[in-house]
Amino acid sequence: TLPPGFYRSLHPLGDASACNLSERNFLAALDDYRKLCALVEQHGGCIEQSLAGDTLTLAPGLTAEVLAPSGTRAAALTASMQELYRTPQGVPEFREKLDALDASMNNFSLILRLTFGKTRILLPGDTNRAGYGGIPPEKLAADLFKVGHHGQLDGADAALVNAVRPRFSVCCASSDRRYNSAHPDTMRLLKDSGAELYFSDCPPVDGQSIPPHRALEFTICADGASSARYLP
């Protein structure tokens, strides 16, 4: 989402200014982003920015269409990051800007729709239901949907599910439900739409017994046939 080389304008933040666990984690994530980008380039990797409208060829017959963020949204994130890093950590304004950025960051996620033959896969990152604005509903239609924001209550709504109409939905939810992932209302919404529900972990889900597993495997065929299984 951010421009290539943007990380070079960032400096270490540390967590001395954090007043709670959420702020401490977000500060650590910002520092990790800077370190990761530097490490990628040190090892000869190339950092590229993808924006809505781009199409990437991942393998023969497999493409990824970038649905979000738009150039305008990416520029807004860049400006917010620059403003945060220009503000001294010791002043109240820093925490205000930090918390505002933390609250909005998920909805700058890269949203991809993969196409392989007749099969489409929607990967919205950590986006919640408010992060799909500006994407034409027909672009969201998919056979396999990785539910955004870990399936929390704001991960999807009826309008989004009606646009996607997935045959399969995957929820990356922690078993301890610490952040209310795999929220019952969100899971019910998807199930009532006719989607088969699958999980990366084993959260308690009403009416469904999820076997202990170490992985979830999908087999996607170009003719539209798909299947899923838990690997014990």
Predicted regions mapped to residue ranges:
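Short alpha-helical interface elements
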Residues: 137, 185-186, 194
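Residue-level detector of buried hydrophobic side-chain packing
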Residues: 169, 190, 218-220
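Histidine/acidic-residue-rich catalytic or RNA/ligand-binding cores of hydrolases
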Residues: 157-161, 181-189, 210-215
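Stable alpha-helical elements in mature extracytoplasmic
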Residues: 29-36, 131, 157, 186
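Flexible, acidic/histidine-containing loops and adjacent segments that form or flank the divalent-metal
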Residues: 1-122, 195-196, 200-232
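Active-site-proximal loop/helix segments of hydrolase catalytic cores
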Residues: 73-182
